[in-house]
Amino acid sequence: MRVYKTNEIKNIALLGSAGSGKTTLAESMLFEAGVIKRRGSVEAKNTVSDYFPVELEYGYSVFPTVFHVEWNNKKLNIIDCPGSDDFVGGAITSMNVTDQAVILINGQYGPEVGTQNNFRYTEKLGKPVIFLVNQLDSDKCDFDNIIASMKEIYGPKCVQIQYPLETGPGFNSLIDVLLMKKYSWKPEGGAPIIEEIPEEEMDKAMELHKTLVEAAAENDEGLMEKFFESESLTEDEMREGIRKGLVTRSIFPVFCVCAGKSMGVRRLMEFLGNVVPFVDDMPKLHNTRGEEIAPDSNGPESVYFFKTGMEPHIGEVSYFKVMSGCVKPGDDLTNADRGSKERIGQIYACAGANRVAVEQLNAGDIGCTVKLKDVKTGNTLNGKDAEWRFDFIKYPNPKYSRAIKAVNAQDTEKLMAALLKMRQEDPTWIVEQSKELRQVIVRGQGEFHLRTLKWRLENNEKLNVVFEEPRIPYRETITKKARAEYRHKKQSGGAGQFGEVHLIVEPYAEGMPDPTSFTFNGQELKMNIKSREEVDLEWGGKLVFLNSVVGGAIDARFMPAILKGIMDCMEHGPLTGSYARDVRVIVYDGKMHPVDSNELSFMLAARHAFSDAFKQAGPKILEPIYDLEVYVPADFMGDVMSDLQGRRALIMGMDSEAGYQKLSAKIPLKELSNYSISLSSLTGGRASFTTKFASYELVPNDIQGKLIADHEAELAKEAE
């Protein structure tokens, strides 16, 4: 394989909802380019893209698959992205390292929620978009209705390049209004027959051609002037105008294919090779210092690792994009994230499970290598003339959580090691060994996401594991002031233990002034604040600790021990054992003994005094509340709202966005437990949602009572 220059390389992501035909399209592209001799199929489990055992088991893409084709003296690096929202990380990763998105639309359904999600991501990243209506041979395909929906959602920027003469099982021909030709195929597919447009289609074709010419001309002043003069452009001028329109996202070309029979795929590839932007046509990327980095093969060497794959008999396969310079086997590079040195071994052009050895990859190119010592997903490796880091991939928050444990407790360490290793393949799920919840928590993008994780643990790592309901990280706080005192005294011969602490607790809110006095039972207690310590609690909220002891009742040297005793208590609230937060404590009196007082005595006295005061101060349980955004077709809005109201959600607003309804709400984390499953069931998989932590709020009294009872029952069971 020859070495391609930067201006000969195009990087393309195949996006679309699950079932829209991305993997089938990838197979047809490889076939048309002569990379494979026979097209595989998802049903036969023999495609180039879906080759991991878990993908073959479930019949869905789980990981993005990188491959390349050589087409008309150009190299097209193509990434086949998973369509399920559960594996959105693969699509996000791919969009960040490619320069062109091809979004497939299922001809049976038209634009779906996955279409919308992918388009939103391209919008955030400013990536060019081509729409591709697939499965035109389906008897459910209504092409005109699909185009109408697309124009309603995406506006006049959607410009048809092609339209089919017939849809359904009889589909075998289309009109291309860029080339002004008719393309047709034999029933089994194969090479197209290219003919003149039939007379009865000429009016429609000319109308669409004129729209396309105008859209292309709008992206260049010179082309616009010519269009005004002659109302026409040459084919090359149209290509140039469309290329500029793609870069600025002012035009979204619409193509037609039947990927299963390879009808229209060759024409699509010609367009990708001849029209879509090269790597160096796109805006420059920025490093973490905000500096623009051009894809210059003569520049300093810098390589960004965007994906790690774990393959049997090989181990880690590290996928990278050359950001600047060129990379060759034997190059000595420095890991900008970890400080370690790496020598690059053999480098490859990617071809799914296969690889093609190459002698060099230039700026903008994508490849992979194996057997690196200390490189993780997201790391940057630099040559001696570069000191750059790239960190531009931002993943969505997890939406579905489960506690996981090994059936055999002896496998716990092995389980954690396997989880940490597997996370290199997919950064969109998180593993946490929670001290607070006393569980190992895995958080992912949905039930299917974690189900495939479990399958891989059991089948690849030979670990027998179970999922459980994760505990909720409740918090405890107080709602009124209270005071308490406690004397710790212990005498058993020799030096004893003595410490007495008098303290007041009250709710704390940001910006509260320090108190000057308190009144209890008609008695006023004056406060003379001698020291103040504000603790930002690692679990959220604050503890404010004030020393108001006068007259030397307690030496200042014992105050750290008193604070430690209080902090120990705040780690185990009295209601449910949850962390406590947002409390102000004022130590105002106490006693000490000249011989028996020590730090332990005051720590224990403070612990008891604080616990007693907390229980008297109107203790309440707080629950985590999340911001929720649901994208749902209007037909399902009523059902979704009813379901949310049954989950104690507070509806904050509704809006229309790209043909869908966007519903905003605040909802307790407890009620999100199986929301992804319920939403999919309610909408037939046509809705999606995002979540983000918002705040902690008081739980209703009836729920507080149940939580306390459950905690007491758990303690009783542990004591048996």
Language-model regions, residue ranges each:
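Structural and coupling elements of P-loop NTPases
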Residues: M1-E720
